[in-house]
Amino acid sequence: MTWELIAQLTFLTSIIVSGPLVIALLAIRKGNL
């Protein structure tokens, strides 16, 4: 495991994890309005 591969994996995982979170936050904001 090279550092570049680890960095790419963490970057992809953060995008995959943060995607639904951002959508949920937008849905909550729209619901509050």
Swiss-Prot record:
Principal place of residence: plastid
Membrane-crossing segments per the record: 5-25
Membrane topology: Single-pass membrane protein
Key words, A-Z: Chloroplast, Membrane, Photosynthesis, Photosystem II, Plastid, Thylakoid, Transmembrane, Transmembrane helix
GO molecular function terms noted in the UniProt entry: actin binding
Localization: Plastid, Chloroplast thylakoid membrane
Family per similarity comment: Belongs to the Psb30/Ycf12 family.
Functional summary from the UniProt entry: A core subunit of photosystem II (PSII), probably helps stabilize the reaction center.
Subunit structure: PSII is composed of 1 copy each of membrane proteins PsbA, PsbB, PsbC, PsbD, PsbE, PsbF, PsbH, PsbI, PsbJ, PsbK, PsbL, PsbM, PsbT, PsbX, PsbY, PsbZ, Psb30/Ycf12, peripheral proteins of the oxygen-evolving complex and a large number of cofactors. It forms dimeric complexes.
Protein name: Photosystem II reaction center protein Psb30
Species of origin: Psilotum nudum
Gene field: psb30
